[in-house]
Amino acid sequence: MPSVINTGHHHFSISNIFANWRAYYDITKPKVVALLVLTALVGMSLSVPGALPWQRLIPAMLGIGLLSSAAAAINHIVDEKIDTVMGRTHNRPLPAGKISVTNAIVFATSIALLGFIILYALVNPLTAFLTLAGLVGYSFVYTMYLKRATPQNITIGGLAGAIPPLLGWTAMTNEVVPNALLLVLIIFTWTPPHFWALAIHRKNDYAKVNIPMLPVTHGVSFTKTQILLYTVLLFVVCLLPYLVGMSNWLYLIGACSLNLIFFGYAWQLKFNAKEGTAMATFKFSIIHLMLLFIILLLDHYWLPMG
């Protein structure tokens, strides 16, 4: 017999989730969460020498993954009305009517609670509360307020999405250290050029729903300049793990190569853009971050510090 929660006009049930599992899966932004969990895994790996204890590794990844999924679902709930209008998002599960807002709220709350309990009980309270702070920062401070209030929304709000390496680090060590914050700084610096490239591509959608993204408020040319400058800043920030002795030559070569390519995309976007250049830059930025952190991982295990 399915477990059912009565929520007024709607019924939230386990059978409802199984019937619409794809829609619930989609509102958790699984590809984004996978990248966040990868960066958390790198934070864990760099925090301790040798193999990671699976008794800590599995609950940490599960808890961080569940709370990140809940944050993504809350983002869908808050943006449901503007998603209905925007071309990129009108087919998402909530505006398309595949899931009710009430059911989405119950689902998001349930997986957030489960994730928090796993982290608190099986990892440590510090990681549980930091992960919860990330959820609040992204879902409420960024999505509810900053996104609608300032063109610097993603610069400030990006901090919430940048903390998974710190969460991974604290999961293993139960302390906040400068090297963990350095990994956060990389993602924090990467976020604006990543997101603004998409915002250029979707400028008209954002203008239609009065979201003050940088291309809407300051124009596309200004935004392209900012993207180019941020890729230069990102290049410098990505050198820091090598310069402070966190990583070796393998990471240095990988970081320089990836950042040169990212800079090349940003240069083309600014000075020789074609119709698809903004979207191509956005897509490469995701590959950039994923490969950068995979190379950090390979560098750590293949070339252990002497």
Curated annotation (Swiss-Prot):
Record's subcellular location: Cell inner membrane
GO molecular function: protoheme IX farnesyltransferase activity
Membrane-spanning parts: 32-52, 58-78, 103-123, 126-146, 153-173, 180-200, 227-247, 249-269, 278-298
Organism, scientific name: Colwellia psychrerythraea (strain 34H / ATCC BAA-681)
One of the protein's GO biological processes: heme O biosynthetic process
Xref: NCBIfam families: cyoE_ctaB, PRK04375.1-2
GO CC term (a single one): plasma membrane
Cited Pfam families: UbiA
Membrane topology recorded in Swiss-Prot or TrEMBL: Multi-pass membrane protein
Entry EC no(s): 2.5.1.141
Domain of life: Bacteria
Transmembrane in keyword set: yes
Name of the gene: cyoE
Name under which the protein is recorded: Protoheme IX farnesyltransferase
Similarity-based family: Belongs to the UbiA prenyltransferase family. Protoheme IX farnesyltransferase subfamily.
PANTHER family documented for this protein: 4-HYDROXYBENZOATE SOLANESYLTRANSFERASE, PROTOHEME IX FARNESYLTRANSFERASE, MITOCHONDRIAL
Keyword Cell inner membrane recorded: yes
Pathway membership, UniProt: Porphyrin-containing compound metabolism; heme O biosynthesis; heme O from protoheme: step 1/1
